[in-house]
Amino acid sequence: MKAGTGPLLSTLLGLLFLSIQGTGGVNPGVVARITDKGLAYAAKEGLVALQRELYKITLPDFSGDFKIKAVGRGQYEFHSLEIQNCELRGSSLKLLPGQGLSLAISDSSIGVRGKWKVRKSFLKLHGSFDLDVKGVTISVDLLLGMDPSGRPTVSASGCSSRICDLDVHISGNVGWLLNLFHNQIESKLQKVLENKVCEMIQKSVTSDLQPYLQTLPVTAEIDNVLGIDYSLVAAPQAKAQVLDVMFKGEIFNRNHRSPVATPTPTMSLPEDSKQMVYFAISDYAFNIASRVYHQAGYLNFSITDDMLPHDSGIRLNTKAFRPFTPQIYKKYPDMKLELLGTVVSAPILNVSPGNLSLAPQMEIEGFVILPTSAREPVFRLGVVTNVFASLTFNNSKVTGMLHPDKAQVRLIESKVGMFNVNLFQAFLNYYLLNSLYPDVNAELAQGFPLPLPRHIQLHDLDFQIRKDFLYLGANVQYMRV
């Protein structure tokens, strides 16, 4: 992206502004809200961007004929006008309820340097001049919308630029030329500058800011099974105190996307304003992910002998399994075993103040591998456990880790007689804690991507667990390139 007014709005606007409730009965699955502090930061970044753009303004030459009593007739030209310096001092970015944002800049100045030349008969004079443009004020409305792909849009409207005073210094001590400038050039140049400033803002919004907002992802990959839909539910909404934008935050199977039957619940955000932006992620997003994993069979697992550590005191064959069920070796001598774990239903993430937990229910079925390679079921067990989750937010992702309690095992069915449930429970807990959960945590460490546009980082993170949603406050930094 070119250096432009991109940081102005995109610093925050592109930063996933979501709202508390969507339109048409559709609620967002992820929520963020921008505060006055966030808008103030955007305005500050906007000044830096606008100052860079002001230097790119090209000014026309001014020429014509003159007739001055003491001098006579001749031709003049003020040319090679360039902006040498500019200082934008006061800025504010305010909410424009129902439309978007209003940017105002005041008490600013611009310095212009150029050359002049005069021709009268065979006489030619030339020199330079400096122009101090004082009391510059700029105001423009930034209207927010949504395109068909679900990305935010922005357009400039009602731009106004005003100049309070122009102070010119002309080399050569030619007072009549100074008077000529005031009489014939000053008002024209003032109007040109005012128009050029608004043209620059319009161009920057169209060429820099709008394309930058298009870098906001509509979908993002979570892993080889899951994706997340970050398209807008409705156009960004400016309210009296906050700027809200609504994203679906809908998890889907990347290989087979189907409509989500369960509507997204409504979230109620607290009225916080200490940080620039606040995010909320509904437990809906995590529970849809759990459902997709379950439907895809991703939560099921199998345990074979080659998956056990080499130094394990227990092997998955009928001889080593005699302490669990003595009859198995008599009925199936010297045969291998396989354990197949199935999650009965998609685990539900319980989100309550200060707590994240789930209670998956599983069944584990034991199979004997016959000499024909066929599998014959010999026992079936029910397993329940409580798992606590911890989440970590960095500047672009949400990562997680599971902390399981001990699994509780019960016998559902045995085709090989007596079964030592307590001994199997100890074996299963050893495997889960040392093999299965570390693998799951390695996957969770890959992270849940936040819908951030380019060059945006979050810091000063404050994470809270609320009822039915996760809540994150953050400050924002735009990384200039």
Curated annotation (Swiss-Prot):
It comes from Mus musculus. Disulfide bonds join 159-198. Glycans are attached at residues 300, 355. Belongs to the BPI/LBP/Plunc superfamily. BPI/LBP family. SMART domains: BPI1, BPI2. This is Lipopolysaccharide-binding protein. Its main location: secreted. When bound to LPS, interacts (via C-terminus) with soluble and membrane-bound CD14. Plays a role in the innate immune response. Binds to the lipid A moiety of bacterial lipopolysaccharides (LPS), a glycolipid present in the outer membrane of all Gram-negative bacteria. Acts as an affinity enhancer for CD14, facilitating its association with LPS. Promotes the release of cytokines in response to bacterial lipopolysaccharide. It comes from the Eukaryota. It is found in: Secreted; Cytoplasmic granule membrane. Keywords: Antibiotic, Antimicrobial, Disulfide bond, Glycoprotein, Immunity, Innate immunity, Lipid transport, Membrane, Secreted, Signal, Transport. GO terms for cellular component: cell surface; extracellular space; membrane. CDD domains: BPI1 (cd00025), BPI2 (cd00026). One of its GO terms (biological process) is positive regulation of tumor necrosis factor production. The keyword Oxidoreductase does not apply.
